[in-house]
């Protein structure tokens, strides 16, 4: 989920409601507020809580909430809050800013997992923060039963296959790059956490077609998903996702710096 | 300044006081709390304010406060708070996590500079966050008189020279890498913002010797600063800075994950 | 194909013959001498010609010859030589050493394609030399009918999909990374150019099973190919490929620096 | 030295003579044919020998010859040839194309140094080929007295300082980046191997002024060298160096692909 903004750069809850209804309509399995496409680092802790609360109160879909922060105190606070309001799962990437080795990343997750029982997806997105190695994921998974899977947005299929080798009935591996979903399903991925759902149903159709009609799924990937991803990829991430959503829904949306309006045609 | 921690990973104000007194004793010109060595992203907004306030109340040295956050709301809040309590200047790097182009970085600074009058140092540290180009610094400097300089920790001397070309009476360029201070002074740098000051006076002596005794300054660089930086550089940043400080002062200090204790000898 | 070496680091033609017979036995479609696994840059022009000639004279399999060099004169000489001795196709990566933009790469291929009629595969391997963009491949393909396809060893599936979008009856797209062959076939790849063939038939079985028994192919990938690639990947490339081949065939093989013997168990 | 080319992309010896006379006129200490600016990888072994021979026969200046190749046989041949014709020293970077660890690089140099007595400069240029660590340089220096120094073109001052720590009466450390020469001299560099000498005497004047008039040297760096380097840096390397030389001397010069003409104004 993007985090819709008004002309002043504040969260726009009317627009958020439109987004929630759209996502329910195209039949996603989970809502994922405050992820990277939701530009979570651009908001205060209070804004993040308010947004999670609004999504919870306005949808019956299961929710996985982005709880990322380099500060373990903030992560703990967001996890407890999310659990209290009935959110089903949390999604957490390694800390950002300071470059970290795997030992540091392990200490971070261990501390958080030791003080929270909430189901957690580990989020690997090395473009934006420190990479978590499959080996570290494996160790955390073996020590904490609340670690329920991984969302891998690395776009590195070799690394993704290593994550997939950890899959079992209690451990899911999700692809975070829309244009790699078909390939990932072929290799055994549990599903996708995909940003184009904010304004397009192609990726959901691909996912649902896949089981019965592999050829059709591949066709959707090639004809719908890849061209859309290429188009979005020409702009500073994730500004085009917002503009696309605003334009499609005739919303007078805005941007909070460092975000800015880009000229994508829909 | 590191942010000294106790055995539970909370800020240790007794230790902070020891640190302040040491820095005053070796005669630094400014205190710089909540920078990268101070692991500012590992703290909550409240912890950051409390720490800034403590430093302000316990030293008469001028202070430049790290106010970094990807959230402009948090930056604005930290700047207003800092100004209110009498802190002299703020230090701000570009937003982290999402990879940004220069246009995005410009929008971010512009928004913040438009709503704050506090003197600001721009902080370039591309190892940890998006790089700010000298061209963007130049544009911001020409539009906002509150932009008083840049702290460059890139370790890229060619880029540093480009920053130096912006120097004038109202614009200072500081070197953020201790082992490059001598070279930077030769090229015209205004000074350094140097992490080894937390437990060693070599870099301050180098700076003061430089004007009168260039050879002595070079000797300190080669014999004291570079070997110390190499030793510290063997460990996950900035854990060794903390351990060094704890050991030197016989403090039973601690770590907040992702930080952890490393075995440096002092 | 590796380029088998004797204890003095010279090409070992007896061992080469053993290799040719093995490759024929496991039923590869083409032989590919003097590629990256064949460490072509470690040989003189004369050694390269001699090796190509030996392979040509000792096998009736179609051959694609690595003709890479940053010097267009050397490439032209190798292509003419290869064509004269009846080699079916050439494989050529962009020039290495000096970092090049796409315009430079285009000029290089254009010059070579204008003076040679031999069928050519473009070789994308950005780990080792300048990357060639799908757009540049597309331009070369549209101008020169002798451009018959691309070998992509980038391990970047997103880029590979872009290459695949150029596929047609006269343009083949090959995967150069063994552990990505299954995935690539799913996406429509024409086949693979795979280094583990030097001592293992898994990847060939995978390829042949794929058309009739996709599940079996996936099983081979997971049980045979990926574990083998991981094992090989622990050593300085491509030393372990050589040692594996030597040990398997009880050959007293050697290395030419910068190659050296590694301790892989087979 | 660039390698001047005629309109057909062949070496232009008349132009080479003009270049030699110019370099003698501005009083460089050494000629350095077949380095990176000389695009040595774009030539055949015979062309490289012919060029070295021509330079030797047409100048009494000491010469250091670029003998780089990933093939140790080619390096050995070039070194023996150079020694035979009276060239004073060889310059050699680590092998390119295949990514190598330090052990591989060590094996390569060791093999070459064991079979040649010629004085050698190790050439570090990680932008174009595998990086050689100061530690590896140190080991080679301690084992082979023919290792007389290092040319470092990395533009990494921290690494350069590590190379400088190896300096002694028998081991020189040269800066390969013109705009970093002043800084490097300050730190104790032996001198520079600088590409702008092909058409400009600024860097030579800087070097000669440095000993007596440090301020003048710094002025030349800021007013002449840095602006020239910035201008050249806007184009695909090293095309602008060639065009500049051609234009300045009214030579109808050419390019061998992947080189091409760029529109620099002189």
From Swiss-Prot, chains A, B, C, D:
In terms of PROSITE patterns, this protein maps to:
DHDPS_2
Keywords annotated in UniProt = Carbohydrate metabolism, Lyase, Schiff base
Q: GO molecular-function annotation terms?
A: 2-dehydro-3-deoxy-6-phosphogalactonate aldolase activity; 2-dehydro-3-deoxy-D-gluconate aldolase activity; 2-dehydro-3-deoxy-phosphogluconate aldolase activity; 4-hydroxy-tetrahydrodipicolinate synthase activity; aldehyde-lyase activity
Asked whether the UniProt record includes DNA damage among its keywords, one would answer: no
Q: What top-level branch of life does the organism fall under? A: Archaea
Return the SMART domains for the record.
DHDPS (SM01130)
Q: What is this protein called?
A: 2-dehydro-3-deoxy-D-gluconate/2-dehydro-3-deoxy-phosphogluconate aldolase
């Amino acid at each position: 989920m993007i985090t819709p903004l008004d002309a002043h750069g504040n969260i726009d809850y009317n627009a958020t409601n439109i987004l929630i209804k759209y996502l329910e309509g195209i039949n996603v399995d989970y809502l994922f507020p405050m992820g990277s496409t939701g530009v979570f680092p651009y908001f205060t802790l209070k804004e993040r809580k308010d947004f999670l609360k609004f999504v919870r109160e306005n949808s019956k879909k299961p929710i996985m909430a982005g709880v990322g922060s380099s500060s373990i105190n903030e992560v703990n606070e967001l996890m407890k809050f999310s659990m209290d309001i009935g959110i089903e799962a949390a999604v957490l990437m390694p800390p950002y800013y300071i470059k970290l080795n795997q030992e540091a990343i392990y200490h971070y997750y261990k501390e958080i997992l030791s003080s929270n029982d909430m189901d957690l997806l580990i989020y690997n997105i090395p473009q934006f923060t420190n990479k978590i190695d499959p080996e570290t994921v494996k160790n955390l998974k073996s020590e904490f039963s609340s670690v329920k899977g991984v969302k891998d947005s690395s776009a590195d299929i070799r690394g993704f296959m290593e994550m997939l080798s950890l899959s079992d009935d209690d451990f899911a591996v999700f692809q975070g790059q829309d244009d790699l979903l078909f390939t990932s399903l072929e290799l055994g991925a549990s599903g996708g956490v995909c940003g184009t759902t904010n304004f397009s149903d192609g990726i959901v159709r691909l996912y649902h077609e896949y089981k019965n009609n592999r050829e059709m799924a591949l066709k959707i990937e090639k004809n719908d998903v890849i061209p859309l991803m290429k188009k979005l990829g020409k702009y500073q991430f994730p500004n085009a996702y917002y503009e696309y959503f605003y334009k499609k829904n005739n919303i007078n949306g805005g941007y909070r710096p460092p975000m800015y309006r880009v000229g994508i045609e829909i």
